[in-house]
Amino acid sequence: THGSRIVWEALIDEPLKGLKLLFGDHEKHDPSIYKYAWKIWFFGDSQSYFVIRVAALFDIFTFSSYSATAILFAAFSFSGSWALFLTFYKIAPDFHKWIAFSCLFIPSVFFWGSGIFKDTITLAALGWLTYSFYTVSFERRNMVTNGIIGLFAAWIIFSIKKYILLSFLPALIVWFFLAR
């Protein structure tokens, strides 16, 4: 993306400033990074800038190639969709075809989970949050690892679209108490 390329260029030209752009608190106006920050259209929007940061992390490995970065976004999104599929498959294996269709093959899920969007990241995080919640709450295995994955996924969703987390948490709570 445009913004992630600027962060990537900063990492190449001036690594400390690039790291500030990547990991620093962008809401504190640091004059040392102004040279790069003013070029990033969404620098002032923390939710959009989070996506730029993720894309910039991927850009490190893809040398800022848009196509390769988009493939990494799609792979991350698919991993979350697959985790969601596995979760529901464990619950109802007899309905595996319907579960696969609903988690993996619905066109809108396929579309929104395949580009460099906020939705791509939140879809993946939602899948991983569901998977880790089920594994910790019902299977009671790998609780530390899955707890960390769940907290990380919740943090990602909270950083990008708080309302998704606020509407999903009550569903998890109801699921937890009804399944017991």
Predicted regions and their residues:
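Membrane-interface transmembrane helices that cradle and orient dolichyl/undecaprenyl
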Residues: Y89-D94, L129-T145
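Short acidic/glycine- and proline-prone juxtamembrane loop motifs at membrane-interface regions
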Residues: G115-T120
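Juxtamembrane segments of multi-pass membrane glycosylation machinery
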Residues: D30-L72
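Perimembrane helix-loop-helix junctions
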Residues: T130-F138, L166-R180
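Extracytoplasmic loop-helix module adjacent to an early transmembrane segment
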Residues: T1-A37
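Short helix- or helix-capping micro-motifs
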Residues: I99-L104
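Transmembrane-helix motifs of polytopic, lipid-linked glycan transferases
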Residues: T69-I91
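Membrane-interface alpha helices of multi-pass inner-membrane proteins
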Residues: F110-F111, T145-L165
